[in-house]
């Protein structure tokens, strides 16, 4: 086992981070969370008293903060970003400042301060629209948006810095789905499930675009697995992380079927043509990583969370919708 004890999770209070952090603590890592907490300050409440957790409220663009918090860190799992195309396009200057401009010094400071391993959450949308049945990690990137373009550029920045003592790994996740303490209801499966349960109708925009998905429990298990891998196995590696590839129309049909075949589905036109079907063959062969959780499980998890009141006011509370929060706080 690699001798890695302290993990810094940027964006650790976000949708993925708030599921990942408790798993790392369960594995007895010391965990430091760096986050702005703009989506809520209580998402890590169940583990707040854990002596191995340190929460730092701050901005990854603050270099002095990074210089103060990174020393003593063995691993950085970098999740923090303006995390989808609509939120990025709301203020492209802001998006670039967080997603790309801040990334360069983050990597430099990490390397200079002896961080052993840097795991970067990129996106599978870097591929753009592909006609191939299976999009592999070696295919050229053809991003359709600045959000995806700068995600790809960050990959280049990180992999250039990799050395024997600074292990760099890139994950290109599919769209994540399922329940989280920091719930998002602006992701494909989650959107359709929310509207089916709480609005009584599913509206599909377009429908034929392919959207790969991965359950939030699987993507967070993957990040834990990467900490346990020998350095040589993941050095300078790029991995797609996906389980199920479906069209949006098919996802809507899965939602309807899972909830009892009672929800009408309406089809609306769209000009969002992002479509991709990614292969997870490499990560399965090299790391023996097999996702275990299905879209149906994500739907049922969300249904249970709605029933238990864990996602109050799902149609109106802006905290579940990244772009609405960004608009409300006027982040600069």
Predicted regions and their residues:
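N-terminal Rossmann/SDR dinucleotide-binding element
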Residues: 1-75
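C-terminal substrate-binding subdomain of Rossmann-fold SDR/epimerase-dehydratase oxidoreductases
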Residues: 200, 205-208, 212-332
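Glycine-rich NAD(P)-binding loop of the Rossmann-fold in SDR/ketoreductase-type enzymes
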Residues: 61, 94-105, 141, 145, ...
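SDR active-site strand-loop-helix element
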Residues: 10, 34, 76-79, 118-123, ...
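NAD(P)H-binding glycine-rich loop region in Rossmannoid oxidoreductase-like domains
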Residues: 60-98
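NAD(P)-dependent short-chain dehydrogenase/reductase
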Residues: 156-211, 216-227, 255-257
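Conserved Rossmann-fold NAD(P)-dependent oxidoreductase catalytic core, especially the SDR/UDP-sugar
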Residues: 104-146
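Conserved catalytic-core motifs of eukaryotic protein kinase domains, centered on the activation segment
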Residues: 43-44, 86-93, 129-133, 181-182
